Design a protein with these regions (language model features):
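Hydrophobic alpha-helical membrane-insertion segments, chiefly the h-region
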Residues: 16-25
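N-terminal Sec-pathway targeting helices
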Residues: 1-13
Length: 264
């Protein structure tokens, strides 16, 4: 049976591998029965796929078809790692966060496999197996975080979002796939210690979806003044929290929640 994130984000180990201008890494494992139970009840995602672009695009002046640079980039990463499970690259402008994203049918897989698919405690960054990159109502990307002077931990900078001033300067997340780049605006930042409903994918109606989106917005630790509605498609970045205010909790996940505002 597939598992959503049975072991994730507690006690980070990491390694960095610089390839093609991006950094790829990460983490350790921890069993969490609660998250397994969520997935047992929720194993399918909404099927609201975006229209896929042609592999070739026309030059705006000549009308001649030219290769799709996004697809070429993803294919290059697949070849570099000899791994067909590369689905995109996630980044936050003017930050250290810039990582290739993988996806496997078993959500536990990349907790203990590296970018080459080899067994490794450092793992790597990955997309929830139920998500479809830059399509559907919700994408969830998992990455580990920890304290280290020697190892590069890309998602560690997410903890800077505890500071509203940092948020003001870093409101957007880019998620590139083989067809283009999705731009997402962050509207909520908070630490979850018990309620795992943010992982739900299936919603019976637009109204139930909007109720969920509004719930995520209301959980934010500060006001972002970003409006949301029932048409929004979300990207959630999840990592462990090392903030001392949440030290007493066993499970503590920092969630950075954003809505898609553009795709091109």
């Amino acid at each position: 049976m597939k598992q959503i994130i049975g072991r994730i984000l507690i006690g980070a180990l990491a390694v960095s591998i610089p390839v093609g201008g991006s950094i790829f890494y990460f983490a350790s494992k921890n069993d969490e029965q609660k998250k397994n139970e969520i997935v047992d009840k929720d194993t399918k995602t909404d099927d609201k796929d975006k229209d896929k672009k042609d592999d070739n695009v026309k030059h705006p002046s000549t009308g001649v078809k030219v290769s799709n640079p996004h697809k070429e980039k993803i294919e290059l990463f697949k070849q570099s790692y000899n791994n067909d499970e590369v689905v995109g690259v996630i980044s936050i402008p003017n930050s250290s966060i810039n990582a290739v994203v993988f996806q496997h049918e078993d959500n536990d897989y990349y907790l203990e496999h590296n970018v080459f698919g080899g067994t490794a405690l450092e793992g790597t960054v990955y997309l929830d197996y139920r998500s479809k990159v830059n399509s559907g109502r919700k994408n969830i990307v998992y990455g580990h975080n920890g304290d280290s002077d020697k190892l590069y931990l890309p998602f560690s900078e997410l903890e800077a979002y505890y500071d509203k001033a940092y948020y003001d300067e870093h409101q957007y997340v880019l998620f590139e796939d083989e067809d283009g780049v999705g731009t997402y605006q962050i509207f909520s930042v908070y630490v979850e210690t018990s309620d795992l409903s943010y992982m739900y994918m299936n919603f019976k109606s637009d109204s139930s979806w909007f109720e969920h989106v509004q719930y995520l917005k209301n959980k934010s630790m500060y006001e972002t003044n970003v409006d949301v509605d029932e048409t929004d498609e979300l990207l959630i970045l999840q990592t462990c929290s090392h903030n001392e205010n949440f030290a007493k909790y066993k499970d503590k996940y920092l969630l950075v929640v954003a809505k898609r505002v553009n795709y091109e």
